[in-house]
């Protein structure tokens, strides 16, 4: 079973912000899938995708706890037999750069840190989407909670759409090695 979690903040005022790139990916993923059932549980909007042949259910999750408390929602849904994939923004990657890694520290991302603390492990997949970094450290909060410029937004949408396509393949074949390789080699400035 896959537990695919997009990190973001609930509310219309956060919808188009850089910090909500995890939700952008899930929104695009949902347009590519059929047979999703929506449920509200565990402080989250949860879409279930049932696989009749495999007798499995995958979950696409939008935590409604706000970014820094995402661990509360994930802990409520997570079971050890699940493959957890967390999609989030990354200030240290250039705009549109994508990276997948398994395990490791939160690298200062408070949403990821909340999940690590809640689960007591860092053993899960992270899909990082670069949003770049503002010029000044004092501007970080306004930057991540701000909307990207038009050209920046186009690059982020290309990256989010590519990740959504790769998640569709992962849902089908569970090939994490290919998933990681494809996303790590993607260049949103070249691929249209």
Curated annotation (Swiss-Prot):
Keyword hit for Lyase? no
PROSITE patterns found in the cross-reference section: PEPT_TRNA_HYDROL_1
Gene3D superfamilies this protein is in? Peptidyl-tRNA hydrolase
What is the uppermost EC class here? hydrolase
Active site: residue positions = 19
Q: Where does tRNA bind?
A: 14, 66, 68
Name its cellular compartments. Cytoplasm
Alphabetic keyword roster: Cytoplasm, Hydrolase, RNA-binding, tRNA-binding
Q: Which GO terms describe its molecular function?
A: peptidyl-tRNA hydrolase activity; tRNA binding
- For the site labelled Discriminates between blocked and unblocked aminoacyl-tRNA, the residues are 9
Highest taxon above the source species: Bacteria
The record's function comment reads:
Hydrolyzes ribosome-free peptidyl-tRNAs (with 1 or more amino acids incorporated), which drop off the ribosome during protein synthesis, or as a result of ribosome stalling.
Description of how the protein assembles with itself and partners = Monomer.
Can you name this protein?
A: Peptidyl-tRNA hydrolase
Source organism per UniProt: Coprothermobacter proteolyticus (strain ATCC 35245 / DSM 5265 / OCM 4 / BT)
The gene behind this protein is: pth
């Amino acid at each position: 079973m896959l537990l695919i979690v997009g990190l973001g903040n609930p509310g219309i005022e956060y919808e188009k912000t850089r910090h909500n790139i995890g939700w952008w990916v899930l929104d695009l993923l949902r347009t590519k899938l059929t047979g999703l059932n929506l449920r509200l549980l565990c402080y989250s909007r949860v879409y279930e995708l049932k696989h009749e042949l495999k007798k499995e259910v995958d979950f696409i999750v939008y935590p409604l706890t706000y970014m820094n408390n995402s661990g509360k929602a994930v802990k409520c849904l997570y079971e050890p037999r699940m493959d957890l994939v967390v999609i989030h923004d990354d200030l240290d990657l250039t705009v549109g750069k994508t990276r997948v890694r398994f395990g490791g520290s939160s690298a200062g991302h408070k949403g990821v840190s909340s999940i690590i603390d809640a689960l007591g492990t860092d053993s899960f997949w992270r899909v990082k989407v670069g949003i770049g970094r503002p010029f000044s450290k004092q501007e970080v909060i306004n930057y991540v909670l701000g909307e990207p410029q038009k050209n920046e937004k186009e690059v982020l949408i290309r990256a989010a759409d590519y990740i959504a396509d790769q998640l569709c393949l992962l849902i089908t074949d569970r090939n994490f090695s290919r998933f990681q390789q494809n996303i790590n080699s993607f260049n949103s400035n070249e691929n249209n």
